[in-house]
Amino acid sequence: MQEYGAYLMTNEKINVGFKLVRDVVLITDKRIIDFDKQGATGQKMRVDSINLSSVIHVSAETSGFGLDDSEINIHYISSPYFKANGGVSIAEKKLEFPKKYNIQQLYRFLQELAYANHERINQ
């Protein structure tokens, strides 16, 4: 996790990290950070972050028989304002986990977060 520490904001704390099929995902106290290794060697890397307060929907697909991986799809508000008169922009991020990883606990955490955000935004 040390190699990713430079991408943290001041006083941001890592709660948990995951090595995915090709990427690394960190969940901090503020956001979800996806380190997308690209190219044949994985030297090139794209870094995306999703503010935890913007997560509004989560879906999961467990691995089946064979070579399938498990997936968690995170839908989040990507526009700067959560309540915009002209509507908000929604984006989706798919995280692919190795077959052996049990995604249930992470799914539950993200779903509880999405539900709390939905309630807060719609008050």
Labelled PLM ranges:
Residues 40-123:
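Acidic, Ser/Thr- and proline-rich intrinsically disordered linker/docking segments
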Residues 1-27, 98-99:
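Anionic N-terminal interaction surfaces
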Residues 22-41:
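Short, compositionally biased strand/turn segments
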